[in-house]
């Protein structure tokens, strides 16, 4: 990769992260460390991720996505939960800009203006459980350690389900997801109560996947057995590493032995669909340490593995250490090598690298995640959760106190440019990429021709490919997908 490409990547990182602020936070939840994976290689020269000082290029708005919103001090614990969601007045100039965009789009203006991003006849429910026992050294998502507020929060979430019962229209709910925070701190009866209430208010007769994020040390045999009875059929276990020293550095509350045991216990309890999270790019823990973690993960045989690159955020323990000069991100070449190691190891073991951060055995792609990437409607319940009805984004306040108190959600209608950019940002993260015929039908021939024209330098180097009428970044090159996306965004 030549110096020009590296420089371009640095600019890309800044631009794409700014634009990414406009994606829903529930999408961002599943991207979680999203741009940590393919954009982190440029963190040393780029500002912090959304919620950490980034401002979107077009207009100010909340960081987009359902689960973890950075901080507002929420309670006496002072946990870092840097909130990117702010209660704000509506901006009348948005309508003027949308009309200007429509006129600029020419003959396709009306069609694009009436286009809904919801392209999939399914819907998802997301429940945000923000509580944590301990703050991880890398985490700047919205969280609270006030565990005694679990039941008042659950009651407020049940009220929100009732108030928003018409949000998804007639579309059936196909996926349900509990994210956090640490949802495995939630009693099974509370989880079951939320699912039961949702089933009374929405069409959940065809649910295909119900996921709960969990910490390894929470997964006792009794808890797992009770969890199965609630309807949870997929666990996302936040292991991060199978190295005790690395876990200690990250301030994780489990050990490597507990991590492995949690997977075995989940199998014994009857869970046949497991995904585990791993983090790479941790200074001092690459090479053989990462390889051992990957080998241990493969020996446990999860159906799905998510691998994220560590990002050092300002309002975290790692960020404070970095500010003092005693902690720094790994070098760009190290990031590239570790990404390659993850890709090569997992694909050789039969996992499909189907999205920047995600690997699955055949038939076990994350269905809830895929709904975000392909424009399905979803309803986010809980503090900091975001929702999308096909045309508008809605977001809840990132505060347990204010959420329980009934704070009104914010909302914004997507402009044509927002829709186009989000289409690129989500689809080009996947191995399938975008279909050129579909893109033309949705956004017009002129935009599609511009995509083909401007992506040519990347296709000539093999960083992107156009095959069978589809544009995609090959999985082995996904570390550079940010640069490809930046080329195509409308700013």
Locate each region found by the language model.
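Short hydrophobic targeting helices and cationic amphipathic motifs
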Residues: 15, 29-31, 36-39, 97, ...
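Compositionally biased, low-complexity flexible segments
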Residues: 47-107, 111
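C-terminal scaffold of the Radical SAM
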Residues: 122, 143-166, 171-445
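Local cysteine-cluster metal-coordination motifs and their immediate loop/turn environment
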Residues: 130-141
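Short amphipathic alpha-helical interaction segments
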Residues: 445-457
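Short, amphipathic alpha-helical interaction segments positioned at domain boundaries
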Residues: 478-491
């Amino acid at each position: 990769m030549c110096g020009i490409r590296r420089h371009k990547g640095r600019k890309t990182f800044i631009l794409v992260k700014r634009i990414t602020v406009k994606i829903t936070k529930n999408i961002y939840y599943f991207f979680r460390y999203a741009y940590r994976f393919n954009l982190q290689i440029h963190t040393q020269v780029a500002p912090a991720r959304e919620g950490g000082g980034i401002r979107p290029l077009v207009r100010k708005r909340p960081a987009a996505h359902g689960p973890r919103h950075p901080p507002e001090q929420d309670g006496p614990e002072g946990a870092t939960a840097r909130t990117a969601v702010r209660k704000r007045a509506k901006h009348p100039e948005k309508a003027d800009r949308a009309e200007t965009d429509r006129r600029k789009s020419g003959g396709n203006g009306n069609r694009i203006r009436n286009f809904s991003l919801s392209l999939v006849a399914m819907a998802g429910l997301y429940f945000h459980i923000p509580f944590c026992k301990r703050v991880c050294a890398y985490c700047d998502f919205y969280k609270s350690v006030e565990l005694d507020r679990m039941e008042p929060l659950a009651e407020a979430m049940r009220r929100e389900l009732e108030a928003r019962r018409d949000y998804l229209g007639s579309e059936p709910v196909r996926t349900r997801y509990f994210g956090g925070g640490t949802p495995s701190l939630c009693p099974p009866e509370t989880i079951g109560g939320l699912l039961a209430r949702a089933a009374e208010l929405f069409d959940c007769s065809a649910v295909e996947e119900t996921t709960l994020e969990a910490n390894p040390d929470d997964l006792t045999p009794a808890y797992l057995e009770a969890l199965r009875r609630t309807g949870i059929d997929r666990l996302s276990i936040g292991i991060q590493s199978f190295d005790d020293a690395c876990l200690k550095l990250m301030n994780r509350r489990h050990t490597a032995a507990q991590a492995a045991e949690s997977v075995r216990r989940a199998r014994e309890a009857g869970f046949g669909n497991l995904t585990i999270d791993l983090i790479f790019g941790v200074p001092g823990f690459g090479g053989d340490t990462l390889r051992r973690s990957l080998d241990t993960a493969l020996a446990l045989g999860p159906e799905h593995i998510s691998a994220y690159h560590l990002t050092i955020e300002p309002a975290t323990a790692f960020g404070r250490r970095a500010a003092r000069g005693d902690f720094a991100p790994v070098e760009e070449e190290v990031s590239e090598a570790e990404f390659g190691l993850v890709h090569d190891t997992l694909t050789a073991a039969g996992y499909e690298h189907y999205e920047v951060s995600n690997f699955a055995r055949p038939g076990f792609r994350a269905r809830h995640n895929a709904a975000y990437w392909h424009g399905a409607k979803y309803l986010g319940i809980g503090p900091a959760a975001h929702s999308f009805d096909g045309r508008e984004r809605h977001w809840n306040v990132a505060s347990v106190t204010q959420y329980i108190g009934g704070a009104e959600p914010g909302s914004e209608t997507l402009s044509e440019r927002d829709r186009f950019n989000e289409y690129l940002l989500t689809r080009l993260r996947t191995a399938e990429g975008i279909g050129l015929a579909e893109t033309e039908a949705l956004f017009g021939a002129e935009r599609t021709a511009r995509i083909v024209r401007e992506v040519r330098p990347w296709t000539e180097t093999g960083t992107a490919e156009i095959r069978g009428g589809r544009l995609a970044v090959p999985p082995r090159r996904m570390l550079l997908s940010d640069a490809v996306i930046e080329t195509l965004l409308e700013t």
